[in-house]
From Swiss-Prot:
A family per Pfam: H2TH
The protein's name in its UniProt record: Formamidopyrimidine-DNA glycosylase
Organism, as annotated: Shewanella sp. (strain MR-7)
Zinc finger boundaries on the chain: FPG-type: 236-270
GO biological process: base-excision repair
Cofactor: binding comment: Binds 1 zinc ion per subunit.
Alphabetical list of HAMAP family matching this protein: Fapy_DNA_glycosyl
Transmembrane segment boundaries: none
Presence of the UniProt keyword Zinc in the record: yes
Purpose of the protein: Involved in base excision repair of DNA damaged by oxidation or by mutagenic agents. Acts as a DNA glycosylase that recognizes and removes damaged bases. Has a preference for oxidized purines, such as 7,8-dihydro-8-oxoguanine (8-oxoG). Has AP (apurinic/apyrimidinic) lyase activity and introduces nicks in the DNA strand. Cleaves the DNA backbone by beta-delta elimination to generate a single-strand break at the site of the removed base with both 3'- and 5'-phosphates.
Needed co-factor(s): Zn(2+)
Length: 271
């Protein structure tokens, strides 16, 4: 599943081609995504795209009439293409621009979404209760400590909770906890402020580095140009269960935590 870095890489790739362009058509070939695609043509045709933003793992395409909320789901991608590019299987939506380009949404597994919001996006049900962005000052050790106070849940589950901080999915939660030396099953409310300070710094550094590397390509992710990301080459624990730790040489352990694969070093990461 594309996580925050992959969605941000997509945003950076499509934004220069969309901003200040006028929409001349919207072609929906398959409206049966995670949620049915609403009738958008009347709202969006003729509108000029003002900006392309990201909130958590959602892309927000703003016009004066409202905002398209796009989620890539498990396998979705957005690409900028010439308008006459042949349609392939799983090409579900084309946003057609006046400059002869299209924004094409491809999603083999159809867990993605393309919705419409005329409210301030902060009031949309999908967005209104989200926590702070991890790469902003709003995500800091004081905020995290307050959010974790009294919690008995495993720290990894809390780190992946979008009400606490957005966008830290399974890949980057594994990597950040390894970098911070914190066991993924450590009781969140008992982690001291010094270790939380390190964890916040590692989350920020790892996400920023992943964005710089173009995201992580494991199976499906490609950027707006159809190219893979390269952060997978730098993963220390995710997907490496049973292999040797890059720091101490111990074999990495693999467990299921919150129904997600969790990999850690029992020597380097402590409770």
């Amino acid at each position: 599943m594309p996580e925050l870095p992959e969605v941000e890489v997509t945003r950076q790739g499509i934004a220069p081609h969309l901003v200040e362009q006028t929409v001349v058509d919207l072609i929906v070939r398959n409206a049966s995504l995670r949620w049915p695609v609403p009738e958008l043509a009347k709202q969006i045709i003729g509108q000029t795209i003002r900006q392309v933003r990201r909130r958590a793992k959602y892309l927000l395409i703003d016009t004066d009439a409202g905002t398209s909320i796009v989620h890539l789901g498990m396998s979705g991608s957005l690409r900028i293409l010439p308008h006459d590019t042949p349609v392939e299987k799983h090409d579900h939506i084309d946003l057609v621009l006046a400059n002869g380009r299209i924004l094409r949404f491809n999603d083999p597994r159809r867990f993605g979404a393309w919705l419409w919001c005329q409210l301030p996006e902060e009031a949309h049900p999908l967005l209104e209760k989200l926590g702070p962005e991890p790469l902003t000052d709003a995500f800091n050790v004081n905020q995290l400590a307050a959010a974790l106070a009294g919690k008995k849940k495993a720290i990894k589950l809390c780190l992946m909770d979008n009400h606490i901080v957005v966008g830290v999915g399974n890949i980057y939660a594994n990597e950040a906890l390894f970098a911070a030396g914190i066991h993924p099953e450590a009781e969140a409310g008992k982690i001291d402020i010094e270790r939380l300070t390190v964890l916040v710094a590692e989350v920020k550094q790892i996400l920023a580095h992943a964005i710089k590397q173009g995201g992580t390509t494991l199976k499906d992710f490609t950027n707006a140009e159809g190219k893979p990301g390269y952060f997978a080459q730098k993963l220390h624990v995710y997907g490496r269960g049973g292999e040797t730790c890059t720091q101490c040489g111990n074999l990495l352990s693999e467990i299921r935590l919150g129904q997600r694969t969790t990999v850690f070093c029992g020597i380097c990461q402590t409770r």
